[in-house]
Amino acid sequence: MTEGLLALGIEQLGLDLSPQNVADLELFLQEMTRWNQVHNLTAIDNEEGSIRLHLIDSIAVLPVMRRFLPQQNPKIADLGSGGGLPAIPIAIVEPNWRLTLIEAIRKKTAFLQHVRGKLKLKNIEVISDRVENVALQQSGQFDAVISRAFTNLARFLDLSLPLLKPDGLVFAMKAKRADEEMQNVSMQDWHLLADEPLHIPNLAVERRLLVLTPVRKLPLPI
């Protein structure tokens, strides 16, 4: 895996990133690689190369997200953030977006807090708790929810719904099983706005970004 893979991926995705963006992504990569050796943040084989591809996978969602999020500073929750993917790369590239990283495993939230300080990311909040508990505390507070951690789309949507504002959006990062998972989603409850293929340079797997909005709305908290 060459040092230029991240730069090549950014170019092939058509993203216009500043030198500081790229430097911060590389620093995040270095910190994740270093912490992963001790804390096993993510199951990867070829550490730096694989994480680099995970970085590109994370920022590949940005063109679609920008189309669907007209707000200047949308509030977005990353459910099961793990090692900070996709939220940390998104926060680096979009400093006006406010991201809340929800993760129940404390060694992972310790890493997320470390990265927040190391990269001086003022636009992220790290919450060490279960998603269900956060939904009780911050019901109807988010413009969008995203995750790459959930293999069960229906479960992800159920957890996302209480967090969303009316007309909020869910961005589900999926692979080739997306069609099978969609069969378990009630179209009476959810409207599929987009099913976008994501072309990840140097990653020979199918990646898709589903964009959904709830048909049934939860009442806003009083």
UniProtKB/Swiss-Prot annotation:
Gene Ontology, cellular component aspect: cytosol
Residues bound to S-adenosyl-L-methionine: G80, L85, V131, E132, R148
Keywords annotated in UniProt: Cytoplasm, Methyltransferase, rRNA processing, S-adenosyl-L-methionine, Transferase
Alphabetized Gene3D superfamilies for the sequence: Vaccinia Virus protein VP39
Disulfide bonds: none
E.C. numbers: 2.1.1.170
Superkingdom of origin: Bacteria
Any one GO molecular-function label of the UniProt entry: rRNA (guanine-N7-)-methyltransferase activity
The reaction(s) this protein catalyses: guanosine(527) in 16S rRNA + S-adenosyl-L-methionine = N(7)-methylguanosine(527) in 16S rRNA + S-adenosyl-L-homocysteine
Major location category of this protein: cytoplasm
Compartments where found: Cytoplasm
Pfam families membership: GidB (PF02527)
Stated role: Specifically methylates the N7 position of guanine in position 527 of 16S rRNA.
Entry similarity comment: Belongs to the methyltransferase superfamily. RNA methyltransferase RsmG family.
Protein's name in the database: Ribosomal RNA small subunit methyltransferase G
Biological source species: Polynucleobacter asymbioticus (strain DSM 18221 / CIP 109841 / QLW-P1DMWA-1) (Polynucleobacter necessarius subsp. asymbioticus)
Lineage, top ranks: Bacteria, Pseudomonadati, Pseudomonadota, Betaproteobacteria, Burkholderiales
